Every structure is written in C-alpha cells, then in structure tokens.
C-alpha cells in the first residue's frame, strides 16, 4: 500500500540499510522502503524456490543484522517485521539527533548488539477510527494514516466559547482542546513510539523518556540526587521526583487498611489476601497455590535428588531449593555472615531481617502497620538495615484514615506522648500515582492528640498507644504528619523520627 501522505520529518536523516551486508544510505523514508522492498522481493523469491525443492523446510528468516527473527507461519509476518526495522531505523536516527543536541550527555553504554532487536509485530496494523478499519503491513504508513485522522478531525462546540475535538477511536470518548493533543493521545491507542536509542535500540514515547534512559546510566558520582526513602540515587531532580511518586500510597484496599502506590499492587493484594482462588495445582499431591512461583518452589519438594547445586569451584553443596543454594553461597563463599540488620531502638544486630522482625515485635512490642503484613527495612549510611520509619500517603487517603479514627475515637482515652513509637505517615499533595497482605494485626489506635489545627498544613496528628482493660499497652505505628507537596529531605525526616521516638 502506498504511503497515505507525507508528514513533517527531521532533516538529514541517515537511513542505513542493515539487510545482510548492504551499505545503502538515504534520507527519505519513501526511498528507504522502496529499497528494502527490493531486498524482500528477492529474498521471498529465493524462499519459494527452496520450498519447491523441500516443502517441509518452509521458513521466512530476517537477514537484518543482529536480528535472527524467523517465521514459520507466513511471508506476511516477515514483511511486517522487516518494515518495522525500517521504521525503527528512523527512530534511532531521531534518537541520535536528540542525543547530539545535549552536549552534557554521554552515549548509552548498554549492549550495542541489541540495537536491532524489535518487539513482535501484530498480525496487522488495524485502524479502529470510526467507519475506517484500514489495514496496513507497514507501521510507518499506519501511523501516518492515524495522524491524518487527527488532523482532519472537526471541532465541536460544547459551549459558545469552547470547542473541542473528540477521539474517534473505537470505544474512546476523550475530548481535547486542540488536534495536537488528540494526536498525542492517539499514540496510546496505536502504541506508536517516536524515538529510539541508537545504541541499544530501546524505543520511547517521547524525547524526555529517552533522555532519562541516558541519564540513568551516568556514573554514581554524577547521581547527586538521593531518595530519602530508599536511598536510590538519580542524575536529575526530576528523575528523583518521578521516582518518589512510586513511594506515595494512593490506593486503599476496600476490605482492609492496606494502602499501596499502584493499581497493580492493589490487584495483587486482593488476589493474595482476599481471594480463595488457587488456580495453580500440583500434579503430585493436593497442594494448590495462587502463583506459579510458589508452585515451582513446591514441586522442588517432590524431587528425590537435589535439583540445585552450588556453581562455586570445588564446592559440592546441593539443595532442593534455589533459595538454599543462594543462602549457602552468600554465607560460605561471599563471607556474608556479618549482621546487616540493626534494631533502631536498642542497637542489637541480626543477620536476617525476619530475626529483627521477631525482635521488634516481642522485645519492643511493635505492631505491623494496619493493613500491612511486614516491616520494611532501609539501608543507612553505616551499611546497616534499619526499620523504615516513613510511609507516604496521599492527602485523600490520609483524610479517609483520619475520618475512620475520629468515628471510632474514645474522648476519655488518656494520652501519653512519651510512649510514641513508629512510622511517620507523610501526607503528600498531588494527583493519582503512576500506573503498574495478611490479616490485620490490631487496629491503629483509637485516640488522637492534635498538636495543631487540622486546617494547618504543618499540623501533626499523633495516634498514640492505648491501655487495654488488663493494663497492657498496645504500641503501634503512631504518627501522622501532614507536610508540603513533596516528601521531606533526609535531614527533616531524621528530626521527625527522633521526635516521634521521644529522643
């Protein structure tokens, strides 16, 4: 099918054919496709002659350098695949130009041999714009065709001074103020990428994401922005800000108090904690489980022989589980027997995180955060893993938690701020987070003490421990503090942690 029309393109593209040993170079996509089509026609003609000699040996292999694709189904699969190589070549050129415009960035350091590895193509590129359903084998022509729909879309009046364009994609009702926004939106339907890394071949939806891909590969001494929550480092403040959104819990389980940052996390929680469905069943016994990983671990128990062996030279250790071999390797061959976990209350050290968990619960009477099944530990500058004392909640979730607390509060409850222990739940302003566990261990305390008015953005709400009828204190994660729009720096967090613990 001929191209549905030219679109503005960047100048001076060096489109180099990588079919076999071909060295053809041009600057226009139309000329590039014509050239590659000749390769395809010659290749397909040769494949037909081989098929006549041996009909059982029918296959369609791609000769693009560093590719290795082979289709046993039809020549149409190969045609779509090779045309995608052409489109990918253009994106890599655009990536090269974007990289050359950033004098402070170094090239990608990932494996150059993956530069021509492209995703599996669909059976066809189908336009689902209303009353269209055009089909293409060439992704370039398909994306241009969809662009034409956006450019020809008529404005609709929703009021006297307000006109919008509506997306005509099947099942979509989105509207936009201008055609450019509609064009960008359509990429979410077509999965179109606009730039690729010239080194590793990775494709991206915009230049910003591509340049982030490069910046993430900077050396450690250039990664000057550190996450105060998990200690990961980043090259730019914006990368850090994007990363920290993944720490903010925006979604709450409707069946318990578990909160999480992503819809996918909530789905997993619902499946593992509130569903009785166990679709993965063992063929050797009555065991069933909720995921494939657990089933594979279980199947190892049916093996009479050790399925896993230590690959260290002259070591004969073997075990029926991979985790046992990994643990053996860390302790015996890596010398990882030194304690890495330290209690933040009494400084006692442990070699394993679950031992510290038992210590915190029995020695210091810590409770898991309501709706959460375990403690989380964070590596500090001295190399020790200590209890993570900060959890970020969105404003909406915090208000929901506070409402539940107020509805169940006991006005006669005696408060004792010296007994405060636990997690600071930082309230973070902003919209929903990006797209992507056991039974509750006691409620968050019922009493609240307000250190300031709730309308004050700097107020802190202390959820303190209560004394039951037997005179036993129930120590829980106890501090909610509302901060400004971004999570606090390390220094501010440390100050609040010390205050929360009464230090």
Curated annotation (Swiss-Prot):
Pfam families: zf-C2H2, zf-C2H2_4. Residues 493-503 have a biased composition (Basic and acidic residues). One of its GO terms (cellular component) is nucleus. One of its GO terms (molecular function) is zinc ion binding. The keyword DNA-binding applies. Keywords: Activator, DNA-binding, Metal-binding, Nucleus, Repeat, Repressor, Transcription, Transcription regulation, Ubl conjugation, Zinc, Zinc-finger. Residues 481-503 are annotated as: Disordered. Residues 370-403 are annotated as: Required for activation of histone H4 transcription and contributes to DNA-binding. Coiled coil: none annotated. Its main location: nucleus. GO terms for biological process: cell cycle G1/S phase transition; DNA damage checkpoint signaling; DNA repair; DNA-templated transcription; establishment of protein localization; G1/S transition of mitotic cell cycle; in utero embryonic development; myoblast differentiation. A zinc finger (C2H2-type) spans 17-39, 125-149, 165-189, 195-217, 225-247, 251-274, 280-302, 308-333, 341-364. Transcriptional repressor that binds to the consensus sequence 5'-CGGACGTT-3' and to the RB1 promoter. Transcriptional activator that promotes histone H4 gene transcription at the G1/S phase transition in conjunction with NPAT. Also activates transcription of the ATM and PRKDC genes. Autoregulates its expression by associating with its own promoter. Binds MBD2 and a histone deacetylase complex. Interacts with NPAT. This is Histone H4 transcription factor. It comes from Mus musculus (Mouse). The gene is Hinfp.
């Amino acid at each position: 099918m001929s191209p549905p029309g030219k679109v503005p393109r960047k100048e001076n593209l060096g489109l180099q054919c990588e079919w076999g040993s071909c060295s053809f170079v041009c600057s226009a996509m139309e000329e590039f496709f014509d050239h590659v089509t000749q390769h395809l026609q010659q290749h397909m003609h040769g494949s037909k002659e081989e098929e006549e000699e041996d009909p059982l040996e029918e296959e369609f292999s791609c000769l693009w350098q560093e590719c290795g694709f082979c289709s046993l189904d039809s020549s149409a699969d190969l045609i779509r695949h090779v045309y995608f190589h052409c489109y990918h070549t253009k994106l890599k050129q655009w990536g090269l130009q974007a990289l050359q415009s950033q004098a402070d960035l170094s090239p990608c350091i990932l494996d150059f041999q993956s530069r021509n590895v492209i995703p599996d193509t669909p059976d066809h590129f189908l336009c689902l714009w209303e009353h269209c359903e055009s089909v293409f084998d060439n992704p370039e022509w398909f994306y241009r065709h969809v662009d034409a729909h956006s450019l020809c879309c008529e404005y609709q009046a929703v009021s006297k001074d307000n006109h919008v364009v509506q997306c005509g994609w099947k099942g979509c009702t989105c509207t936009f103020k201008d055609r450019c926004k509609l064009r960008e939106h359509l990429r979410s339907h077509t999965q179109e990428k606009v730039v690729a890394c010239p080194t590793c071949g990775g494709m991206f939806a915009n230049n910003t994401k591509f340049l982030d891909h490069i910046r993430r590969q900077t050396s450690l001494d250039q990664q000057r922005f550190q996450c105060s929550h998990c200690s990961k480092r980043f090259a730019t403040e914006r990368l850090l800000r994007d990363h920290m959104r993944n720490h903010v819990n925006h979604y709450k389980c409707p069946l318990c108090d578990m909160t999480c940052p992503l819809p996918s996390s909530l789905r997993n929680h619902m499946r593992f904690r509130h569903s009785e469905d166990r679709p993965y069943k063992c063929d050797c016994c009555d065991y069933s489980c909720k995921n494939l990983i657990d089933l594979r671990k279980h199947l190892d128990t049916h093996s009479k022989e050790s399925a896993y062996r230590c690959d260290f030279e002259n070591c004969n250790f073997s075990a029926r589980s991979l985790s046992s071999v990994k643990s053996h390797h860390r302790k015996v061959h890596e010398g990882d027997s030194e304690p890495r976990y330290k209690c933040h209350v009494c400084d006692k050290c442990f070699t394993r995180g679950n031992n510290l968990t038992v210590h915190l619960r029995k020695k210091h009477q810590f409770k898991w955060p309501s709706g959460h099944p375990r403690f989380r530990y964070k590596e500090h500058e001295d190399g020790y893993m200590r209890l993570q004392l900060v959890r970020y909640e969105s404003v909406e979730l915090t208000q929901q938690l506070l409402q539940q607390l107020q509805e169940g509060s006991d006005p006669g409850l005696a408060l004792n701020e010296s007994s405060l222990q636990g997690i600071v739940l930082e309230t973070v302003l902003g919209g929903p987070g990006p797209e992507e566990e056991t039974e509750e261990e006691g409620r968050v305390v019922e009493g609240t003490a307000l250190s300031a008015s709730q309308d004050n953005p700097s107020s802190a709400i202390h959820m303190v421990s209560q004394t039951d009828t037997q005179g036993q204190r129930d120590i829980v994660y106890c501090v909610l503090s509302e901060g400004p729009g971004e999570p606090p720096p390390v220094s501010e967090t440390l100050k609040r942690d010390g205050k929360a613990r009464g230090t």
